[in-house]
């Protein structure tokens, strides 16, 4: 993992600047912040400590972050891009589109589609009319090849057997391309013999848009062979030309696979095609030790907090690769994540499947066996990781309290802390174990990290430090204190272990 650490530029969409230009001084020139380092001028990486993205992700690369001691991992999330509420809206939009398929079949023509389009096989079952029972058709876009089972309805033919993706991407008939007629004809005579019965003139097209009220579908689900295209191969509509693509892109020689779901296109409540985006497909997480490029990481999402204390038994769908698809609902795609039975009552049932034993997975403490090394621990459920985030650190689960949703975790400092079992933690040790063992051969290496020289308190003025001032080299006086007057020697307690009334 150490040799595979990538030290190139980070994703611009996942970085931000700390707008601090005071250099640690206030308006009077007094130093208010000591040893700030060089972090104020660096690009800060946005680390996802909440791990609130989709449930499955692939590690694209391990990066070096100059702002923290550990390494970070760039994860591309491949499952559950849309939240459950968005998935429901997307399914309702599909049902509305299927009901209006016949209407679009009368208004749209497929004669203008290129012949190089992909062949689509589609099966549909409808129970609306006797003639719309089971239609199995194979449609070659740009041609008029239909099987015998295709039903012909209306002057423009029936499109009930066509997939909805093709109907959404069809061009209106009055936008069909028109070639010029013979040179012997002039004016409108050159266009009149070439204008078919299924095409409109410019004036007829305007009347059709205003009088019929037929909506014009703008969708990016079908790629045309001509026209401007985005980087992902999708057609750009007229109103999107010139806009900047704000989707995160990979820097350097790394490329993004074509099958990675970035966003799903659906029809919103207003009826116009729009893109549903909930969370970015790329996020930074703290890299665990032994986490390599290409590994799969998982985020646990429990719909009911009460079920987090139950025992987990993987279902048959866990081993089915077809279960990890975006088209499924959130409950179906994560059904094997929901535990069953009693878990905290017996210590003989601490059995986890392979997903729970993988390094880098973020799951609740109630689902982790006793003795497991964890990091990135939450203090409150859903708050985000607050404990054990430094390089090479780890905590250990010591005990799980019976009949209560709490467990005891031993932190790197040796303190045993009682934490809610619904809080999530990441399995493994924080990466970059040798961070504390490095040696600086010269003072410049420390300055490269943004660390300024340490100035003694006796060398300062009285206004800057309690030990400052005096004639010549002064010794003695008060015990060693910090610039704010707190004792710095041993024996001074800074943490209150127990509070008593």
Swiss-Prot record:
Residues 198-213 have a biased composition (Polar residues). Coiled coil: none annotated. Its main location: mitochondrion. Residues 464-474 have a biased composition (Basic and acidic residues). This is Large ribosomal subunit protein uL2m. One of its GO terms (cellular component) is large ribosomal subunit. One of its GO terms (molecular function) is transferase activity. SMART domains: Ribosomal_L2, Ribosomal_L2_C. Pfam families: Ribosomal_L2, Ribosomal_L2_C. Residues 187-217, 459-501 are annotated as: Disordered. It is found in: Mitochondrion. PROSITE patterns: RIBOSOMAL_L2. InterPro entries: NA-bd_OB-fold, Rib_uL2_dom2, Ribosomal_uL2, Ribosomal_uL2_bac/org-type, Ribosomal_uL2_C, Ribosomal_uL2_CS, Ribosomal_uL2_dom3, Ribosomal_uL2_RNA-bd_dom. Belongs to the universal ribosomal protein uL2 family. Keywords: Mitochondrion, Ribonucleoprotein, Ribosomal protein. The lineage of its organism: Eukaryota, Viridiplantae, Streptophyta, Embryophyta, Marchantiophyta. GO terms for biological process: translation.
